[in-house]
Amino acid sequence: MLLGVIADDFTGATDIAGFLVENGMRTIQLNGIPTGDFEVAADAVVISLKSRSCPVDEAITDSVAGLKWLQAQGCQQFYFKYCSTFDSTAEGNIGPVTDALLAELGESFTMVCPALPVNGRTVYNGHLFVFGELLCDSGMRYHPVTPMTDSSVVRMMDAQSAGVSGLVNFQTIEQGSDAVTARLNELKAQGSRYAVVDAFNAEHLVTLGQAAKSLKLITGGSGLAAGIAKNWTKHLADQSDAKHAGSPVKAPTVVFSGSCSVMTNQQVALYKQLAPHFAIDVKACLTNDQYANEVFDWVMTHIQSEFAPLVYATAEATALKAIQEEYGAHASSHAVEQFFSQLAIKLQQNGVKNFIVAGGETSGVVTQSLAVKGFHIGPQIAPGVPWVRSVEGDLSLALKSGNFGDENFFAKAQSFFS
């Protein structure tokens, strides 16, 4: 085992796992920390947790437990994966988890690299942009759990962590990996614990990956994974078949959408023109014990459609706000996730093999409900969104973070069926 990744949510885990596979590392994703014997034959293992927005102490406990399991498997380098939009608050969880992992490893310095240029997440002079907009001006400022009202990664990291951040700017990065290494050493000597790095193109990430090869712990989004993988694949004999085990096959398929992001709204709107679709009634989720059974009947009447039936809770910002005000943000969200859980189980029991899911929380709930312990990582549908196939059984899933993929994502995912 070469690389161990601790991801703070399910879609983030498949995101980084997909980039590792695309760059030649045989990768398995585990849903939570294995208990008992679990044999892993891979170059990289990604543990997906649900620690992005849980209480800080819980996030630390779970992340450190994941690290200890990866250490026991002989991993040589570790990566703490969080969202490329740095989803967090002044309380955490990115900073506290980073500090806990450093302490557990006996290290005092790491890199902070949220950038994912291929999906429009770039860092320039320490400020995070989403498709050219400052993070605080993007749709992320309306996020219901972690509204992002700042764009300075240095400032955000320092607000939620025990150490001090320093910046490696793009001018240094464009001088090459030796210049970056020198700057990292300089920051470390100055007492910085975190090196926030600029990155707004793929070349920056390759350079940063080369400079990070001596770090025991790296933190960031999935963008840097390509550079890290390249460090390891130089020493691997066969990289040609890394994604084969995770490829999907044609079988009964359903699309779930629980995300309310701007891109998911666009994806749902386009897909509704192609496929049968069912909008979830939040009040029914809260009050009707048989609602999942009723929607199950609807899905099964459309399961043989040319395009898989869509069941969605996706709503635009104003509609979402109205729902939260009427039913409560937590209560409505929990009820919808429980609905997806019940529906997923019933569909699996009745022969549905492929699940396309939009939204990190929804993906986590569905994956847990289907009792999938781990995945082989397959081909990428879009940057950061691969098909994955269960290690045990014959389920395939496409787990999409809210804003990932283009407008045609749901239909494109189905073009991969063999």
Annotate each language-model stretch with its function.
Residues 1-2, 59, 67-205, 418:
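Cap/lid and interdomain-hinge subdomains that line or gate substrate/regulatory clefts
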Residues 1-40, 59-63, 115-118:
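N-terminal basic/disordered segments at the start of proteins
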Residues 5-7, 28-30, 78-82, 110-114, ...:
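General beta-strand structural signal in soluble alpha/beta enzymes
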Residues 16-18, 90-94, 121-129, 179-180, ...:
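Short acidic, glycine/serine/threonine-rich loops at helix termini
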Residues 43-51, 305-307, 389-418:
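A structural-propensity feature for long, helix-poor, extended segments
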Residues 131-298:
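Conserved, well-structured core segments that form the ligand-binding/active-site neighborhood
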Residues 299-358:
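C-terminal structural cap/anchor segments
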Residues 352-353, 361-409:
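Conserved, well-ordered active-site substructure
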